[in-house]
């Protein structure tokens, strides 16, 4: 038995999310089907970050165990033959048996894309948040600084969170503008349920002028309520990178 790790890219627009559910299509169920077809085994996969319905990934990390021995290119090409066009295995690598895609991770990075224009985008409607009011990225950047470091992010989680601890450590949070696009780049040790989307929604409230910069600090201190924060839609959210200790070397 060997353990393999995959780098997986997907457009989550048409899926219920990562986790498999009855009677609906998920990223996990599609991957397990494709891997099982190639290996002629019943394959169970584990991911580094469970994405919600409509959320995308540029590099989701997935591991599984198998008895089949074949080349990395054979795995990649074989599995992709059984996957829909909006899911793709980018690379396959052997990994130490101690590795776990979720529990070995030391940080996750997400990017959120906002199309900030009075005229919405038809082509990218399921891949960005089309927002018509002008966003002041300088105000958003100042507000974002309050969120850096280790804090109790209870107010930024949605109902349904199963995490025992609500403390998280945000290492990096940047807000930049590229033409009509506003990008929010965030990395932390882990995230609570819908935490990124709730942070984005709150920063947008500051950027459009509905709330002052210091409102983010008020939110952070308000452990019990939401203070009318909004949740950004799933369409603009991308899982970009998951980091692991250096002794887990992947052959990409």
Swiss-Prot record:
- What's a single GO MF annotation on this record? tRNA pseudouridine(38-40) synthase activity
Q: Which residues form the active site?
A: 52
Q: Where does substrate bind?
A: 110
Which EC number(s) does UniProt give?
Answer: 5.4.99.12
The reaction(s) annotated as catalysed by this protein in its Swiss-Prot or TrEMBL entry are: uridine(38/39/40) in tRNA = pseudouridine(38/39/40) in tRNA
Q: Does the keyword Transferase apply?
A: no
List UniProt keywords, sorted A-Z: Isomerase, tRNA processing
Looking up Pfam families in the UniProt record yields: PseudoU_synth_1
Q: State the SUPFAM superfamilies in the record.
A: Pseudouridine synthase
GO biological process annotations for this chain's record? Answer: tRNA pseudouridine synthesis
Keyword Isomerase found: yes
Q: Gene3D superfamilies, alphabetically?
A: Pseudouridine synthase I, catalytic domain, C-terminal subdomain (3.30.70.660), Pseudouridine synthase I, catalytic domain, N-terminal subdomain (3.30.70.580)
Enumerate the InterPro entries for this protein: PsdUridine_synth_cat_dom_sf, PsdUridine_synth_TruA, PsdUridine_synth_TruA_a/b_dom, PsdUridine_synth_TruA_C, TruA/RsuA/RluB/E/F_N
Quaternary structure and partners: Homodimer.
Q: What does this protein do?
A: Formation of pseudouridine at positions 38, 39 and 40 in the anticodon stem and loop of transfer RNAs.
What family is it from? Belongs to the tRNA pseudouridine synthase TruA family.
Protein name, entry field: tRNA pseudouridine synthase A
Species: Blochmanniella floridana
Q: Which gene encodes it?
A: truA
